[in-house]
């Protein structure tokens, strides 16, 4: 008996190129990494709005919409943290392969974690953006009161306080929001991203 292809649907689906031509843009992953309170989600939301104004389709993935949904069965053990990032990367790959500009905003504290995400998504489609705002500034902001709880020992293994954060070795871009305004951060990102994703209506 001939070996059956258990994934025959992949051979019949429209290609990534078909979808990118329909959208008039190239799919790419912008992976924002940095400490809690560094400005990742704020930048992601502002960038999405600017890209949307230009007729470009985007999707944000962050802790709120991932942990409350597909990853709501995961905790914060070492194993669960790896699985959290693995699932995010797999979801991100689906969006990127559909031609969507995907913006992921996650602490993702280890280089190995981010390298795993890059391998899943595809190195050529993965732009690592380091939101390098210093700990002292992030702790000063502490909008959710997490740093205060971590200092009191109420939160264990909190990145930057009781757990390490490994700065990216070769990020595509570094943004320190203690020195850059939100507008400056977004404009810097646009300068990086627009030439890569193409403009609506132009051949990509």
Curated annotation (Swiss-Prot):
What GO biological process terms are annotated to this protein in UniProt?
hydrogen sulfide biosynthetic process; sulfate assimilation
Q: Where is the active site?
A: 108 (phosphoserine intermediate)
Task: Write out the transmembrane intervals.
Answer: none
Q: Which Gene3D superfamilies match?
A: P-loop containing nucleotide triphosphate hydrolases
List the pathway annotation: Sulfur metabolism; hydrogen sulfide biosynthesis; sulfite from sulfate: step 2/3
Q: Which domain of life is it from?
A: Bacteria
Q: What is this protein called?
A: Adenylyl-sulfate kinase
